[in-house]
From Swiss-Prot:
The binding of ribonucleoside triphosphate to the RNA polymerase transcribing complex probably involves a two-step mechanism. The initial binding seems to occur at the entry (E) site and involves a magnesium ion coordinated by three conserved aspartate residues of the two largest RNA Pol subunits. The keyword Transferase applies. This is DNA-directed RNA polymerase RPB2 homolog. Its main location: host cell. Its EC number is 2.7.7.6. It is found in: Host cytoplasm; Virion. GO terms for biological process: DNA-templated transcription; viral transcription. One of its GO terms (molecular function) is zinc ion binding. It comes from African swine fever virus (isolate Tick/Malawi/Lil 20-1/1983) (ASFV). One of its GO terms (cellular component) is DNA-directed RNA polymerase complex. It is an enzyme of class 2 (transferase). It comes from the Viruses. It catalyses: RNA(n) + a ribonucleoside 5'-triphosphate = RNA(n+1) + diphosphate. Keywords: DNA-directed RNA polymerase, Host cytoplasm, Late protein, Metal-binding, Nucleotidyltransferase, Transcription, Transferase, Viral transcription, Virion, Zinc, Zinc-finger.
Length: 1242
């Protein structure tokens, strides 16, 4: 039988003509990749996979409950004969519907739309319906069994959070017009969750690759004699199945131990050879052969391995000393059962019963079959395969010990996976479902069997017990816990008073602009470990850019300061995250391939002696082949056809260990690359003919030679078709022009950095490229916003990726229908004159400002900018700032309305109630500090006084900045409680102290608003909008901004928009010619006049348009935070922190250093102590106890000393006094010792 080979043949590469293809045309390939998957399509696809496959698979397959417990009921004679009861149930149907909401006024359920959930503080969750089969079996002492069965019809158990835009969302497949009608942004892709009215994003989370051995040297610590360890997490399937971990350790004593981590297995380091003996392989030679493969080989590596293994077998272990030399597998299994089994409380009690011992042994083996390397199989007939695989793992660890191979690179994406929202929520769902649903059902049945005789049970009793167990608190527990896992961000959440590790990493979605929203959805977080927070070499290495990042992780975007540097990353622009593929069909295809010998047909000796390569699929060892390179290449060609092998299949040949790996698991990063074809076969034949002709003495032997050619089949016409929308990425994949490559397979590729590099080596046979890349693909969306980023210092590009997410703009198009807290909506936004490819996917967030690079007075130092007052008056960076006020009616006694002063007490002094109409200030009204904006009163229960029926609980506006009431709503909450919701609007023009930034990360602060009459101007009368200090560029090396200004100047004069995407070629000569055509100097500098004196400047000034963005850091919001007054804590009197509570600013280290350097220590004391919670306390000198002081009536009194008291005033702090009160409440007295009085002579 011939191996399966590709059927499609491609035309000769010599016939491909793409000389007209430019670097700018290659950008269309990025557009095709983004248009195919969408910037966040992987996130929605991951959640859809969870809904369609994950939740049904978890509930149906992982929660088949089968427990037996001793019957405690003894009311009748039949009860006394009943020994035990077996409870079995499994779920037969799982269905998750679209979100619904109970309409309390009509008493029915209606569809819950996303905006309704936002306004009403609801959670966008869909009902979870389950159906089940229950079997109850009673076992009697006389051997009789009695069975009761019941089918549970589908009913709602709880609700599950639904992702906006998924196939369970009401906006799924809606047109833009339909989205507008329901108050949604028509261009919004979704990908986030709405929980309790807030929007939350589940981050992509890094994880190690399962079914892969990760080998690491272990740091020698006190009490730990471990040298090296290999960790292996085995997972059958590829997405939602349970996993099991084993840890193989090599100790300083020479021992090799295996630790199995499972809930059904106690943690214990078992000598490795006992695992082999327990599964029936008792001979030492047979055991060692599974590791070294060939005992007869005399190679130095083989000899050294045998020495290590023989020594490890004879190393004594105190715990396993009784079975160290035991060859009887039954005794070994029984000994392990006593040590590590969890399913029997006292295994040693069964030693006298042979039947019980046999049952325990078989049960132990059955458990081991399921938890030991389950990806290799979970039945008894797969034990030999597992032992061979376990031997291979130990073999690889020994190779690392001998320095033949290096340990695993922890930071390489070759051995990592990125798990999306589907996998993260599945992990949380497993633990929460077990605690909140399964446990109550079991307890419900136990309670039923305790109260009702088994023979009296009916199908109705069983159904009612099943439903009652879930109708109490389970529904709310499951829903509340899933919401808590998304909202809290805590590492541990409580479910039914049980702590559960939270596997979900989330962040609140702050809609500052569209770029910020997309960046939040493309965030990749690394697990926060103890190593990450330490100042160690490991903490530094895990934050660096790894060689496997380019093309998959943006090499520029991360946090610029703090612990998240290098730990919070972004996907590159073309990177995508794969869901799990169909493993079974590919496995069957590989096993039927004649080139692959199945594992059972290959002996260990043949692997070494015949030089066979191992073949794996999702980490499962399925067989061997003779030519690994040919096998990998053949299946890659089949993948290009897309009929037999899925296009997203990873095919990797590890040449160091000669293994071929096929991966279809979830979480693989992938990106499209253009394929490079060549004529190597023709070239080799021609060279062979030329060599033969030369041997025969043919003088014209060189005529047989042909040039080597390598090229891509991508042409400029295809680039035009992509931009026209007639050609897609799927078409390119189907035509064999591009394919998807993962970080593993990238190690088998030689990728040309650009089309220019490919052409440079077009005829170089020593550098045969497999693919050609687009240079811009190494950056993410936020980094691609920066023009000519390759000319700017990388650190500045990193700053821009963070500043670009803070800029003001249009945060969404549905803003009139939303009520958001602290949102800025900028009025005028322009497309930049020098745009980048990123602007095809995000709306603009800035203005083309005329910038003069000069020193003009003392107000524009490096970090400050002079702004033209005329620019501010024309609406430059002007916008609207929104706040919300939300008030809930806490009980039936509260109501909205204008308080009547005749029957309401506790009215706020000095407050203005006149603007209230039906409890709310009307829309369009200007409110100022002291105005009541929401009127609320509460009826006093039991009050008989007609003049004091109500108490005032109104909300007063407390800001100095006037506001306009923009919207007023009265939505109903989840329990039909009424809210008062008000949106306030503020005009936010550019003020002194506000921040702005260019797209090159050059940030500046508005230091002076200069009148138009004082601004400098050119000979043509052009005045700059901003004056930037030229010294800010040499130190920051923002060359990209200089190029942007020069190109923007030419574009403005010629009325065109050009592309300034990073890595595009820059023709300086052509740029100078464009400026000369418009009558300017070749470098763009112009002669300018001083606006204050009217004189010429001695030097030419560089002036031109630069795209600037206003950052959402407003001085008006921070003004109250630096004052000596503001809200304080009611107990300690200290200032509150945080903007939400209108608290003060944190005094940072740099501010502290500045004040210390200036000798202003008293200022620090004043701000940190006196203005914080400073107070005067009165203490008696005689006894040291606090004294009583009344200022209005000059009373000085000590409760201990009475008239003999000697009272002194002491500078103290409110927090100190609170602490003393708490200690006295705990019956611990604190006395103060004051210094003696010093009397100075008159």
């Amino acid at each position: 039988m011939e191996p399966l080979r590709p059927q499609i043949t491609y035309g000769p590469i010599e016939a491909v003509n793409n000389e007209e293809l430019t670097e700018a045309d290659m950008l269309s390939f990025i557009s095709a990749a983004v248009n195919s998957t969408g910037l966040i399509g992987y996130n929605i696809k991951s959640f859809d996979d969870l809904m369609d496959n994950g939740i049904p698979q978890i509930v149906k397959q992982m929660f088949n409950v089968d427990i037996t417990y001793k019957d405690q009921r003894d009311h009748t004679e039949i009860d006394k004969l009943r020994e035990s009861v077996q409870i079995q149930f499994n779920f037969t149907d799982v269905n998750i519907e679209r979100p619904q909401h109970r309409n309390y006024s009509q008493g029915n359920k209606i569809n819950l739309l996303p905006n309704k959930a936002r306004l009403c503080g609801l959670s966008y969750s869909g009902p979870v319906n389950l159906a089940a089969e229950v079997i109850l079996t009673a076992h009697y002492s006389n051997g009789r069994q009695e069975v009761k069965r019941a089918s549970i019809p589908p009913f709602q158990v709880s609700t599950f959070p639904i992702m906006r835009g998924s196939n369970r969302c009401h906006t799924y497949h809606l047109s833009k017009t339909a989205k507008k009608e329901i108050g949604e942004d028509p261009n919004e892709p979704g990908g986030y969750f709405i929980a309790r009215g807030g929007e939350w994003v589940v981050d992509l989370l890094e994880n190690i690759r399962f079914n892969t051995l990760h080998i690491h040297y272990h740091t020698m610590q006190q009490g730990n004699n471990e040298i090296i360890r290999g960790e292996f997490i085995s997972q059958p399937g590829g997405a939602f199945e349970n996993s099991s971990q084993i840890i193989i350790r090599y100790m300083t004593t020479g021992a090799i131990t295996i630790e199995i981590n499972s809930t059904k297995f106690s943690k214990l380091r078992i000598p490795w050879y006992l695992i082999f003996r327990m599964f029936g392989m008792t001979g030492d030679d047979s055991i060692i052969e599974q590791v070294v493969f060939d005992l007869e080989s005399n190679s130095p590596v083989n000899t050294f391995m045998i020495e290590i293994l023989e020594k490890s077998i004879h190393v004594s272990d105190p715990i396993f000393q009784p079975v160290q030399h035991e060859l009887n597998r039954e005794k070994i299994i029984q000994f392990l059962s006593e040590k590590v089994s969890k399913f029997v409380s006292n295994p040693s009690a069964y030693k006298s019963d042979e039947n019980a011992v046999q049952y325990l042994n078989e049960r132990q083996l059955t458990i081991l079959d399921k938890i030991l390397l389950p990806h290799m199989g979970q039945t008894a007939d797969t034990r030999v395969r597992k032992l061979r695989f376990l031997g291979l793992l130990i073999h690889k660890i020994l190779l690392v010990i001998m320095n033949v191979f290096p340990p695993t690179d922890r930071d390489s994406y070759r051995t990592k996976r990125v798990h999306g929202s589907g996998v993260s929520l599945a992990k949380a769902f497993k633990a929460i479902f077990n605690t909140s649903v399964i446990a109550p059902i079991i307890n419900g049945f136990k309670e039923l069997l305790k109260q009702t005789a088994f023979e009296d049970l009916t199908q109705r009793n069983i159904i009612e017990a099943f439903s009652a167990a879930l109708s109490k608190n389970s529904a709310s527990d499951l829903n509340r816990s899933m919401e808590q896992s998304i909202i809290s961000g805590n590492k541990t959440i409580m479910v039914r008073q049980r702590p559960i590790v939270n596997r979900v990493s989330t962040q609140s979605l702050e809609r500052k602009n569209l770029l910020n929203t997309i960046s939040a959805l493309r965030t990749v977080n690394t697990h926060s470990t103890t190593n990450a927070s330490k100042q160690t070499e490991r903490a530094d290495m895990m934050r660096r850019v790894h060689a496997s990042y380019p093309g998959y992780i943006c090499v520029a975007q991360s946090a610029d300061t703090g612990e998240k540097v290098g730990m919070s990353k972004q996907l590159a622009i073309t990177a995508n995250v794969c869901t799990a593929g169909e493993v079974l069909s590919l496995k069957q295809r590989l096993l039927s391939d004649p080139a692959i010998q199945q594992l059972a047909d290959v002996s260990n000796k043949d692997i070494v002696r015949k030089g066979l390569a191992r073949v794996f699929i999702n980490g499962e060892w399925i067989g061997c082949c003779t030519n690994a390179f040919e096998l990998a290449q053949r299946y890659r060609m089949l993948r290009r056809e897309g009929k037999i092998v899925h296009p997203h299949t990873t095919i990797y040949w590890d040449s160091m260990v000669d293994e071929v790996e096929f991966w279809l698991d979830v979480g693989r990063l992938t990106r499209p690359l253009l394929i490079v074809d060549n004529n190597i076969e023709k070239y080799n034949k021609a060279c062979y003919k030329a060599a033969e002709a030369r041997k025969k003495g043919d003088k014209d032997w060189e005529k047989h030679k042909i040039p080597f050619i390598q090229n891509t089949r991508f042409t400029s016409q295809m680039a035009k078709d992509i931009l026209a929308g007639t050609l897609t990425l799927e078409d390119l994949v189907a035509q064999g022009i591009c394919e998807f490559i993962t970080p593993e397979e990238a190690e088998n590729c030689l990728v040309a950095f650009s089309i220019t590099e490919l052409r440079k080596h077009k005829h170089d046979v020593t550098r045969r490229f497999t693919h050609v890349d687009v240079p811009q693909a190494i950056l993410g969306l936020a980094a691609l916003v920066s023009p000519y980023a390759n000319c700017t210092q990388p650190a500045r590009v990193t700053y821009e990726t963070n500043q670009g997410r803070q800029t003001g703009g249009w945060y969404c198009f549905s803003w009139p229908y939303r009520v958001d807290m602290n949102r800025f909506f900028q009025f005028y936004n322009e497309m930049p004159l020098v745009k980048t490819i990123a602007h095809n996917y995000v709306i603009p967030n800035g203005l083309n400002t005329i910038v003069a690079y000069m020193i003009y007075g003392g107000y524009n130092q490096e970090d400050s900018v002079i702004v033209s007052q005329s620019f501010i008056d024309r609406g430059g960076f002007a916008g609207t700032f929104y706040r919300e006020e939300k008030v809930e009616l806490e009980s039936d006694i509260e109501s909205f309305g204008k308080p009547d002063p005749l029957i309401t007490k506790n009215l706020k002094p000095g407050a203005n109630y006149e603007k209230l109409v039906d409890g709310f200030v009307p829309v369009g009204t200007v409110v100022k500090k002291g105005d009541i904006i929401i009127g609320k009163v509460a009826k006093i229960r039991g009050e008989k006084d007609e003049l004091n029926k109500y108490i005032d609980r109104s909300v007063m506006y407390g800001f100095d900045e006037p506001a306009v009431v923009d919207a007023v709503m009265r939505p109903h909450g989840p329990n039909d409680e009424i809210f008062g919701l008000m949106r306030l609007r503020y005009e936010r023009n550019l003020n002194i102290g506000d921040k702005m930034s260019s797209r090159s990360g050059n940030k500046g602060i508005a230091a002076l608003a200069l009148p138009t009459s004082d601004m400098p101007f050119t000979e043509d009368g052009l005045q700059p909008d901003l004056i930037v200090n030229p010294h800010s560029h040499p130190s920051r090396m923002t060359n990209g901004q200089m190029i942007e200004t020069t190109v923007g100047l030419a574009n403005a004069l010629q009325g065109v928009v050009t592309d300034g995407t990073a890595f595009l070629p820059i023709n300086v000569q052509l740029l100078s010619e464009r400026l000369a055509q418009e009558g300017l100097r070749f470098n763009g500098c112009q002669k300018m006049f001083n606006g204050q004196t009217g004189e010429y400047f001695d030097a030419a000034i560089f002036i031109g348009p630069t795209y600037h963005q206003r950052l959402q850091k407003f001085v008006l919001d921070d003004r109250y935070a630096v004052a000596s007054y503001g809200p304080t804590d009611a107990l300690t009197g200290q200032p509150l922190d945080g903007k939400r509570s209108h608290g003060g600013l944190r005094l940072g280290e740099m501010e502290h250093w500045v004040l210390t350097a200036q000798g202003a220590m008293q200022t620090i004391i004043e701000k940190s102590h006196d203005d914080s919670d400073g107070c005067i306390s009165y203490i008696c000198r005689n006894c040291g106890e606090p004294a009583i002081y009344n200022a209005s009536h000059p009373i000085y009194k000590c409760m201990n000393c009475d008239v003999q008291a000697d009272i002194s005033m002491v500078d103290s702090r409110r927090s100190s006094i609170v602490f003393q009160h708490e200690m006295r409440a705990a019956n611990v007295n604190i006395t103060s010792v004051l210094s003696p009085r010093v009397f100075q002579p008159a």
